[in-house]
Amino acid sequence: MSIQRRSLLQALAAAPVAMPALTGVTSSLAPTASSAASSSPKQPNTYQVKDFGAKGDGTTLDTKAIQAAIDAAAKTQGTVIFDGGVYTTGSLFLKNGVTFRVDQGVRLQGSQNIEDYPLLPTRVAGIEMTWPAALINVYQEQNVKLTGDGIIDGNGKVFWDSYWNLRRQYDPKGIRWAADYDCRRPRLIQFFEAQNVRIENLSLYRAGFWTVHICYSQDVTVYNVIIRNNEGGRGPSTDGIDIDSSRKVLVEKADITCNDDALCMKAGRDSDGLRVSRPTEDVVIRDCIIRDAAAGVTFGSETSGGFKNVKVSGIKVYHPTPVGILFKSAQTRGGSISGIEISDVFMQDVPVVMRVNLNWYPAYSYAKIPEGIKDYPGYWKTLSTPVPKERGIPQLSDVYVHDVQAVGAKTAFEISAYPEKPLKNFRFERLHLDAWAAGSIANAEDFSFKDVTLLSLDGKSVDLKQSKNVRGL
């Protein structure tokens, strides 16, 4: 009996405790050529990729044929469709007005040859640079829709392995910070300088790098997607959905398993991010499930352009995700974060409920070229350009967290900032937190707690350090 995708999501949401059984859900969901019930019906203004020479046999590289169908559809604002099968492809570029439909029984599978992903100007981890295109690109286009109940599979393990191999070389040399940029890996989907774009109902597997990257874009909707990046390993940097210096973005009903940040706001890194100075703003994230990730909802670490007017609600976060709500940055990032509202969050066995760490991961955050290295790419210089301290320390203010329940946590709060720029005007209301320890708050001003129940098993209250006007604890 086939399992319908929406029914699966409803069933998973209704039974959150049974997490171990969900780790292999993608295997049972994975359509193959033999599972396709029939060919997609040909409708007016549709473009069947097999009419352009695509094979869908899992081995033939179908990039040119699929791109030809996309280009033809762009002339009439048409729809690209697939018969059931496994289509191996390199980078595809969707065009204005195109609907790209990957139906049930179709798997679009990424090539494992990095040469099949052409280099192009983009932004990667906060730096503008040349980098391989994503598997699916909406690059300076508008009015594009990705839809269907099928699978887009990055087939990314070869890229995960190449990253870990490079880390083994770089870490002993003190250049761990460079590995993420030097190891070129394709994202699964990127919207770059795009407008009025929608992705819905798809299952996204095994991204080689970030899964959905929304960069310099506006009016973007991500709806009812399943992300499963931990199949066959745990891929590094396999963020779920990254919203990067973009505005008017809605993310709704995403169900995510990954090995980095699940839902993440970004806005540029250090000197380059401060130069671009483009915020992420007017973002709504709601009704999402985080099953396994580095953090549930993350702001940073690329904070240089700032974040404002971000509303997150209806989020469920489960073990083994280590942090539910995370603000992370560094003293070279800068940027202003304000107007953040986080509500209606449930966490089960998540070790840390909320963390603010503005000196996050120094080996990655602070780029310094060792004296013995003379030959290096230009972006190393960009990464290592000094940032004056007065510009480098980020400012966080006006954060409202309410209606949060956490059970089985180790620590409720791990919150700290710099004395030069303390955290300001945080409000916490209607929290019910069951944790081993209450935790600590440092360098905070004007924090208020109302209707907060904190059941700390060690019997201690929150440790306040270098803070003033903290009320209600």
Annotate each predicted stretch with a short phrase.
Residues S2-L473:
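Extracellular/periplasmic carbohydrate-active domains that bind, remodel
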